[in-house]
Amino acid sequence: MSAHNRGTELDLSWISKIQVNHPAVLRRAEQIQARRTVKKEWQAAWLLKAVTFIDLTTLSGDDTSSNIQRLCYKAKYPIREDLLKALNMHDKGITTAAVCVYPARVCDAVKALKAAGCNIPVASVAAGFPAGQTHLKTRLEEIRLAVEDGATEIDVVINRSLVLTGQWEALYDEIRQFRKACGEAHLKTILATGELGTLTNVYKASMIAMMAGSDFIKTSTGKETVNATFPVAIVMLRAIRDFFWKTGNKIGFKPAGGIRSAKDSLAWLSLVKEELGDEWLKPELFRIGASTLLSDIERQIYHHVTGRYAAYHDLPMS
């Protein structure tokens, strides 16, 4: 991943001037979604590229060490080898970008990946995921413990009430403490945009998170009623672009929640390419949080190679 974002001083004068043009954002989202994202002959290559952006995730109450092992195996071998050979991509080292688990499962993931002989990063959700409604002291300790157990990326959740009540300085201070607790681990800040009320709040929260030292800003926990949407993403991507123009710091973007199909993944790649350019299309600056997306990508690649759709037994690890 890229170098840490060390953050900037809080600039409330900038925050106070922000006002998002909601109808214009919706029009832009409709324009992008109406286009064909990738020509058919290029789809397999783009789908393989999408695989390398996935934070392969399991965040279930019934997670065990055995299904964490399966997750890590799939992260290392995301696409069946014979399919990769058919595309002449079997020797390119294609893996997912990371695995993402609960803090209590970090040790399991680190152990499984070490046994598999690969250096895929382990990301952990933390800071009272998914609601962010536990005591700050507890949230900070959760981050520290996840890092201590071997997580090199931490996906924290913000306290949404600070956004809804306009407590921007308190939000900045909270994320600064998260940044410090992460140490050398990279910080991804989940805004839970479906619970922020307005697109203006989404932009302001994005900017505060970047000022406070977030290496990535992330749309959602995946547990909200409304998760990653194009209008929200456009606002966040414009905030990333504005922050880059102002500071020279490139901040990553991670949509998560409801991204399940190969077609969805291509649409998200196209959106990031349109709004930020090709330089953001690398795992250091773009991730997709997903648990079932990889299965559909592998099915589509199977169809591209064989001309038929896979039966369940054809892709048993999906």
Curated annotation (Swiss-Prot):
It comes from Homo sapiens. It comes from the Eukaryota. CDD domains: DeoC. GO terms for molecular function: deoxyribose-phosphate aldolase activity. GO terms for cellular component: cytosol; extracellular region; ficolin-1-rich granule lumen; nucleoplasm; secretory granule lumen. It is found in: Cytoplasm; Cytoplasmic granule; Nucleus. Interacts with YBX1. The active site is at 155 (proton donor/acceptor), 218 (schiff-base intermediate with acetaldehyde), 254 (proton donor/acceptor). It is an enzyme of class 4 (lyase). This is Deoxyribose-phosphate aldolase. Transmembrane segments: none annotated. Catalyzes a reversible aldol reaction between acetaldehyde and D-glyceraldehyde 3-phosphate to generate 2-deoxy-D-ribose 5-phosphate. Participates in stress granule (SG) assembly. May allow ATP production from extracellular deoxyinosine in conditions of energy deprivation. InterPro entries: Aldolase_TIM, DeoC, DeoC/FbaB/LacD_aldolase. GO terms for biological process: carbohydrate catabolic process; deoxyribonucleoside catabolic process; deoxyribonucleotide catabolic process; deoxyribose phosphate catabolic process; pentose-phosphate shunt. SMART domains: DeoC. Mainly expressed in liver, lung and colon. The keyword Nucleus applies. Belongs to the DeoC/FbaB aldolase family. DeoC type 2 subfamily. The keyword Nuclease does not apply. It catalyses: 2-deoxy-D-ribose 5-phosphate = D-glyceraldehyde 3-phosphate + acetaldehyde. Pathway: Carbohydrate degradation; 2-deoxy-D-ribose 1-phosphate degradation; D-glyceraldehyde 3-phosphate and acetaldehyde from 2-deoxy-alpha-D-ribose 1-phosphate: step 2/2. The gene is DERA. Keywords: Cytoplasm, Lyase, Nucleus, Schiff base. Its EC number is 4.1.2.4.
